[in-house]
């Protein structure tokens, strides 16, 4: 077996499949593009779904890739096992309706065992297969594999919901008896026993059925085009090739671990407790790549996952004695390890470091808040005479504040308490189940559409014309290919078309179709790309249409031009975002509609009013400069040399279209654009908002819609000016400021009057002092207009020695407001209010010296006042 670096293993994989006629697909962003079903790209095949379900037919049906992926449904196992990771690389080879079982097995065996390639010892390889899949068994036998090395496993059938499915055959590497202390042997495979001896290195899925959850597996229909989908984990392959005990002792992780050793002063013990080193090494890879791809830490979705990973790694850093932000210092090491295939980490190093360091500092503050929350829990339990921190509270400390269970148990032990570990684990399992359920939701591929896949006629989109005459080549009606259609809805393909198919965020053209006599025969309501790439026109048929006939196709010119203005403005906006916010503000999605444009981009905070003003100003200046728009078709390498901005994660063919706006913007784009920026007229941002962790959205309008938006604002300002009796709009701010000052003065006078009234009333309230359990207290109902007046009463009470405890109740509207205050350490106002509030169907809490509660049962106010003595 050859000794190789991880970079050499990856490259050998790609080189081998290239010799078998496979196109090498580049790794795409971890953040899925145009796939809302996935939180992350979680496999090599996730980026190829449209090929497998037949939505798109690839140029080359043979594909190979090395794809970075993230799976986080088993975060807690990372660091505990030899092979669990959050981020990993999946090596794959795929056949879309081309070769099948025989070639897949033959070539896999060749790559693994040939001296020219990996040169694995043949006697170290074991294969599992689906019991009913005799063809795979026979093919392995034909390759020379011993029958004793072929294990039938009932679970070797791949399916996730509806769509492509089929048996799979897995390849394992036997690391020997040293990893099998009980000498169980091949039974470890037969009985699916977790072990470190037989390492799964490759799974070959033979996708030959359209799975249908409504019928038994035996009734699944054969796919019209059978596929091969395989996955081999790079980390596992490298561990086997480098003879590492675990994946972490390979060149993919050890440089990171060495850096952690330097930062901590601790030494990684291969055979000892090294979990913290492993967690940090794994999680910093995920953080570096995910943030580099535009995901940012937050409270939901991808952001929540990243925040969890960072906090877990940070806590493990503390276990190693690192008590300051340190994870950001590991980013350069991650970048250097991966730069041969993934240069983006080093390219975005400064930004990634900034985000991670900021999040580490924020977590330090959160930990402090968590410490306060933990102290409150302990104090409340002591006050109630209880000694067990609930599983829910322990989980909240873990989930919200990042406290590992062990830290909560230490806090409990110091207070002579324990933690409900079973309750914590139950809450944890609920969360894990939710995570796993979300993973399954996104796994299914759609059913293959045989009719559309079978249409292979050539059709071209003409950028230069808005109307032309072309032959009708295909008609699909009621999911069948037909020669003619007379009424209803149909899908049409022409030899050539001026209609733009929806793509790249630009909506489709609408328009009309005429026959040779000039009669209107169909209305075009949508245009999409067919599986083989042809523009597919959805039409409402108004008169008979037949194959082989020529028709005049004419787009809605006004609609097209309005969309073009918005699309060109989107390019200007993208460039302005880079200039104002930074290069990290890259496109995360866009929509170029008729009446507006919507642009999603990565950014770690809300865009300020000043920044929005600068962005809007810059876009308009480029419009007024009347910059010419030029388009050129070239190869991808030339486009990159031109400085074209490609959307990370998008797939581009050999030939690409470059759209240049003066010397201001250069982007790869297949959409339609105006000839000069002056045609846009004017650009206006109407809204900026967050749509998810680390992702912002700008809604903007151009031309007529922008003018109308400005007019609406002007009319609103005129109305305000009239109300304020301002002669001119520009005087409105001054008038508003004057009103605000008047309001502040009135509020001040009102507050002073309330204080005087409270002081006068308090003289009566504070006279009624009672005794209970050695404490003096006042419990009274007062008449006030708001809860703030209760605090005024309390402030007056604090200034003199009226009593040890004060409880005030007020009926305000249909609600009940309660205040408790204490001057003695023996009575905790927050705990007292928690016991009193339920009497009026309320709840509340607060500090030891003052607390508030709200309730709704006014009839129970006398009961609450009567209960004060008992609670004391």
UniProtKB/Swiss-Prot annotation:
GO terms for cellular component: cytosol. SUPFAM superfamilies: Class II aaRS and biotin synthetases, Putative anticodon-binding domain of alanyl-tRNA synthetase (AlaRS), ThrRS/AlaRS common domain, Translation proteins. It is found in: Cytoplasm. Transmembrane segments: none annotated. Keywords: Aminoacyl-tRNA synthetase, ATP-binding, Cytoplasm, Ligase, Metal-binding, Nucleotide-binding, Protein biosynthesis, RNA-binding, tRNA-binding, Zinc. Its EC number is 6.1.1.7. Its cofactor is Zn(2+). Binds 1 zinc ion per subunit. One of its GO terms (molecular function) is aminoacyl-tRNA deacylase activity. Zn(2+) binds at residues 567, 571, 669, 673. InterPro entries: aa-tRNA-synth_II/BPL/LPL, Ala-tRNA-lgiase_IIc, Ala-tRNA-ligase_IIc_anticod-bd, Ala-tRNA-synth_IIc_core, Ala-tRNA-synth_IIc_N, Ala-tRNA_ligase, Ala_tRNA_ligase_euk/bac, DHHA1_dom. The keyword Ribosomal protein does not apply. Disulfide bonds: none annotated. It catalyses: tRNA(Ala) + L-alanine + ATP = L-alanyl-tRNA(Ala) + AMP + diphosphate. One of its GO terms (biological process) is alanyl-tRNA aminoacylation. Belongs to the class-II aminoacyl-tRNA synthetase family. Consists of three domains; the N-terminal catalytic domain, the editing domain and the C-terminal C-Ala domain. The editing domain removes incorrectly charged amino acids, while the C-Ala domain, along with tRNA(Ala), serves as a bridge to cooperatively bring together the editing and aminoacylation centers thus stimulating deacylation of misacylated tRNAs. Catalyzes the attachment of alanine to tRNA(Ala) in a two-step reaction: alanine is first activated by ATP to form Ala-AMP and then transferred to the acceptor end of tRNA(Ala). Also edits incorrectly charged Ser-tRNA(Ala) and Gly-tRNA(Ala) via its editing domain. This is Alanine--tRNA ligase. The gene is alaS.
């Amino acid at each position: 077996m050859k000794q190789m670096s991880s970079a050499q293993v990856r490259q050998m994989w790609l080189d081998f499949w290239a010799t078998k006629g496979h196109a090498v697909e580049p790794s795409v962003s971890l953040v899925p593009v145009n796939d809302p079903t996935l939180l992350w790209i979680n496999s090599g095949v996730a980026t190829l779904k449209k090929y497998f379900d037949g939505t798109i037919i690839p140029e080359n049906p043979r594909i190979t890739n090395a794809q970075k992926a993230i799976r986080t449904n088993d975060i807690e196992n990372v660091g505990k096992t030899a092979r669990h990771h959050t981020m990993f690389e999946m090596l794959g080879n795929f056949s879309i309706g081309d070769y099948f079982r025989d070639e897949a097995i033959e070539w896999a065996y060749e790559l693994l065992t040939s001296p020219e390639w990996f040169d694995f010892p043949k006697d170290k390889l074991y294969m599992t297969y689906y019991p009913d899949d005799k063809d795979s068994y026979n093919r392995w036998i034909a390759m020379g594999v011993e029958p004793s090395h072929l294990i039938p496993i009932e679970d070797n059938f791949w399916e996730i919901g509806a769509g492509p499915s089929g048996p799979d055959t897995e390849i394992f590497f036997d690391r020997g008896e040293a990893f099998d202390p009980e000498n169980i042997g091949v039974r470890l495979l037969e009985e699916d026993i977790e072990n470190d001896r037989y390492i799964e290195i490759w799974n070959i899925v033979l996708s030959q059925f359209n799975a249908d959850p409504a019928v038994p597996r035996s009734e699944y229909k054969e796919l019209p085009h059978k596929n091969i989908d395989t996955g081999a984990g790079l980390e596992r392959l490298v561990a086997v090739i480098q003879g590492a005990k675990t994946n972490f002792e390979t060149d993919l992780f050890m440089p990171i671990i060495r850096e952690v050793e330097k930062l901590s002063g601790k030494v990684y013990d291969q055979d000892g407790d090294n979990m913290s080193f492993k967690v940090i090494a794994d999680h910093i890879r995920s953080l570096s790549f995910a943030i580099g791809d535009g995901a940012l830490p937050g409270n939901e979705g991808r952001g929540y996952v990243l925040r969890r990973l960072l906090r877990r790694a940070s806590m493990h850093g503390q276990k190693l004695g690192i008590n300051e932000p340190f994870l950001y210092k590991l980013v350069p090491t991650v970048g250097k390890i991966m730069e041969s295939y993934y240069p983006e980490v080093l390219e975005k190093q400064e930004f990634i470091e900034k985000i991670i360091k900021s999040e580490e500092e924020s977590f330090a503050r959160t930990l402090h808040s968590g410490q306060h929350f933990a102290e409150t829990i302990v104090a409340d339990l002591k006050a109630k005479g209880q000694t067990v921190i609930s599983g829910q509270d322990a989980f909240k400390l873990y989930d919200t504040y990042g406290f590992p269970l062990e830290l909560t148990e230490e806090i409990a032990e110091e207070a002579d308490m324990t933690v409900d570990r079973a309750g914590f684990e139950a809450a944890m399992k609920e969360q894990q189940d939710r995570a796993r359920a979300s993973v399954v939701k996104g796994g299914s591929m759609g059913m293959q559409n045989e009719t559309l896949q079978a249409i292979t006629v050539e059709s071209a989109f003409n950028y230069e014309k808005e109307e032309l005459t072309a032959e009708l080549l295909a008609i699909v009606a009621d999911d069948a290919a037909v020669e003619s259609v007379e009424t209803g809805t149909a899908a049409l393909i022409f030899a050539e078309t001026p209609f733009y198919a929806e793509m790249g965020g630009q909506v489709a053209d609408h328009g009309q179709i005429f026959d040779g006599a000039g009669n209107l025969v169909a209305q075009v309501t949508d245009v999409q790309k067919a599986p083989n790439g042809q523009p597919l026109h959805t039409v409402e048929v108004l008169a008979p249409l037949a194959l082989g006939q020529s028709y005049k196709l004419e787009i809605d010119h006004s609609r097209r031009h309005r969309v073009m203005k918005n699309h060109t403005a989107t390019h200007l906006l993208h460039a302005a975002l880079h200039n104002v916010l930074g290069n990290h503000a890259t496109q995360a999605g866009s929509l170029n509609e008729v009446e507006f444009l919507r642009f999603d981009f990565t950014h770690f905070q809300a865009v300020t009013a000043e920044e929005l003003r600068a962005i809007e100003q810059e876009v308009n200046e480029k419009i007024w400069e009347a910059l010419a728009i030029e388009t050129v078709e070239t190869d991808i390498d030339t486009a990159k040399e031109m400085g074209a901005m490609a959307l990370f994660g998008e797939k581009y063919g050999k030939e690409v279209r470059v759209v240049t706006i003066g010397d201001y913007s250069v982007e790869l784009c297949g959409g339609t654009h105006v000839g000069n920026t002056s045609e846009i007229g004017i650009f206006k941002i109407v809204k900026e908002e967050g749509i998810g962790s680390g992702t912002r959205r700008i809604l903007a309008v151009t031309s007529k819609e922008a003018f109308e938006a400005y007019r609406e604002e002007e009319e609103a300002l005129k109305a305000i000016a009239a109300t304020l009796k301002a002669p001119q709009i520009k005087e409105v701010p001054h008038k508003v400021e004057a009103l605000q000052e008047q309001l502040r003065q009135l509020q001040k006078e009102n507050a002073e009057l309330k204080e005087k009234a409270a002081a006068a009333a308090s003289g009566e309230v504070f006279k009624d002092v009672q005794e209970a359990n050695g404490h003096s207290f006042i419990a009274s109902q007062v008449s006030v207009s708001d809860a703030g007046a209760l605090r005024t009463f309390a402030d007056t009470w604090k200034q003199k020695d009226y009593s040890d405890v004060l409880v005030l109740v007020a009926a305000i509207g249909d609600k009940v407001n309660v205040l408790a205050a204490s001057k003695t350490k023996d009575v905790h106002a927050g705990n007292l209010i928690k016991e009193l509030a339920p009497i009026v169907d309320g709840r509340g809490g607060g500090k030891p010296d003052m607390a508030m509660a709200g309730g709704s049962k006014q009839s129970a106010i006398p009961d609450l006042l009567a209960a004060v003595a008992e609670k004391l």
